[in-house]
């Protein structure tokens, strides 16, 4: 009951509050690595390619007990005392509304939007009861996920993950999916949405490849980030023990299907998935009682959720556009500083938010959401396409106010073609 849950979590807090216990963080931490990288350059006039590879390893060693991973004292108390009261609780009652303001919700939950929202969705969909989940293990699992996102990233952080998870929930509510998905499908979809950018370093795949990063070597330059997100998610699933009561075969199947969902978010493979999806729609042979077809639709839903920012209202969409562009430009600044060759769309001197967004909507987003609307011709689909049109018009208005905007737009047409192959921060 609630009293027992409180006592168990309070016990965790007391253990973590012992003197000498250091909050740990798994995986890469670009802010620290780049800070070391920058400090080194102050001493050395030039940095060799070998030093670049060494300093951008992103590896950190763990010093604390594996058992106590997942929550600091203050964060746990926030979860207990603040997440589900007042305005935050009122917002969760409208979590299926497409105008859900994830930025406001993140402020109301004191930076715990991913934990609060995902836990609520697990409860809303009846997953806790259906799969007999331990609520304390679930909390710990979600906190570990949230902590493995880098808050220093302007875009690829826990708030983005929460936004994608909320969008995925909206798609799961669409009539065609709601009438066909199983609790298993919902479980995998929500976990994949919450972890789809787990431990994102804030740079894109070409950056990792040209610096000979160990992840690029490990995954042979193929879906490097997506493979890392998936493997990181599997690590947390196993570490949390959330599904330890399920048969081993079921756990392996879960890990594989979550991987297939996350790997589908690789933007360089968009044409592959989009062509397959379009082919099924053209033939009219998409049968949602077939598990394989249903899984393809869930892959497309996650792809849509991942890049749905231009489908939100202008106030929300503009904030996301500014954040993702700042992350692009931050990478470009690093590439300039160390003479690595600036990646397409990452040069703040030649690119603009308006040009990047117009190109992204034209070449990547509109084709995807047009096909999704063919599959699910609902009010939500029309709302999303309507927002895309309005937001695109707004960016074009801002573009006309910029000097040399026509030249920049022409340059973007080439860059956007490169984007489909390598550059969107998947």
UniProtKB/Swiss-Prot annotation:
EC number of the protein: 3.1.4.53
Cofactor note: Binds 2 divalent metal cations per subunit. Site 1 may preferentially bind zinc ions, while site 2 has a preference for magnesium and/or manganese ions.
Domain PDEase as annotated: residue spans: 80-402
CDD domains: HDc
Bilayer-crossing regions: none
Origin superkingdom: Eukaryota
UniProt record, GO biological process: cAMP catabolic process; cAMP-mediated signaling
PROSITE patterns per record: PDEASE_I_1 (PS00126), PDEASE_I_2 (PS51845)
Major location (coarse): cytoplasm
Pathways per UniProt: Purine metabolism; 3',5'-cyclic AMP degradation; AMP from 3',5'-cyclic AMP: step 1/1
Classification via InterPro entries: HD/PDEase_dom, PDEase, PDEase_catalytic_dom, PDEase_catalytic_dom_sf, PDEase_CS
Protein name per UniProt: High affinity 3',5'-cyclic-AMP phosphodiesterase 7A
Organism per entry: Rattus norvegicus (Rat)
């Amino acid at each position: 009951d609630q009293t027992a849950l409180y006592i168990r979590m309070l016990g965790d807090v007391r253990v973590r509050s012992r003197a000498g216990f250091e909050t740990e963080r798994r995986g890469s931490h670009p802010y620290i690595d780049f800070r070391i990288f920058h400090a080194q350059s102050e001493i050395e006039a030039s940095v060799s390619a070998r030093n670049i590879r060494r300093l951008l390893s992103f590896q950190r060693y763990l010093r604390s007990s594996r058992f106590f991973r997942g929550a600091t004292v203050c964060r746990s108390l926030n979860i207990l005392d603040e997440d589900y009261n007042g305005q935050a609780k009122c917002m969760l009652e409208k979590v299926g509304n497409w105008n859900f303001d994830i930025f406001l919700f993140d402020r109301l939950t004191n930076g715990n939007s991913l934990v609060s929202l995902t836990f609520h969705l697990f409860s809303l969909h009846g997953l806790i009861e259906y799969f007999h989940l331990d609520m304390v293990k679930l909390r710990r699992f979600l906190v570990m996920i949230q902590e493995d996102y880098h808050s220093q990233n302007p875009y690829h952080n826990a708030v983005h993950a929460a936004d994608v998870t909320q969008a995925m929930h909206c798609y799961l509510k669409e009539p065609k999916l709601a009438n066909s998905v199983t609790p298993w499908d919902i479980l995998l979809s929500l976990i994949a949405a919450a972890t789809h950018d787990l431990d994102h370093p804030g740079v894109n795949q070409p950056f990792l490849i040209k610096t000979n990063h160990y992840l690029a070597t490990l995954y042979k330059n193929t879906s490097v980030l997506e493979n890392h997100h998936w493997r990181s998610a599997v690590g947390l699933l196993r570490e949390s023990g959330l599904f330890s009561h399920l048969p081993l075969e079921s756990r392996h199947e879960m890990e594989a299907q979550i991987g297939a969902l996350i790997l589908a978010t690789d933007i360089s493979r968009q044409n592959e998935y989009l062509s397959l999806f379009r082919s099924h729609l053209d033939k009219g042979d998409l049968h949602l009682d077939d598990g394989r077809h249903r899984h393809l639709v869930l892959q497309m839903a996650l792809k849509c959720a991942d890049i749905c920012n231009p489908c939100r209202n202008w106030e929300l969409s503009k904030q996301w556009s500014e954040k993702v562009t700042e992350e692009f430009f931050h990478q470009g600044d690093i590439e300039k500083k160390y003479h690595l060759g600036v990646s397409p769309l990452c040069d703040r001197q030649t690119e603009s938010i308006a040009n990047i967004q117009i190109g992204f909507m034209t070449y990547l987003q509109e084709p995807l959401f047009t096909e999704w609307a063919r599959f699910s011709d609902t009010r939500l689909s029309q709302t999303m396409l309507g927002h895309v049109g309005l937001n695109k018009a707004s960016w074009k208005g801002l573009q006309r106010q910029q000097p040399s905007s026509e030249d920049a737009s022409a340059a973007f047409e080439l860059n956007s073609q490169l984007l489909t192959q390598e550059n969107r921060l998947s």
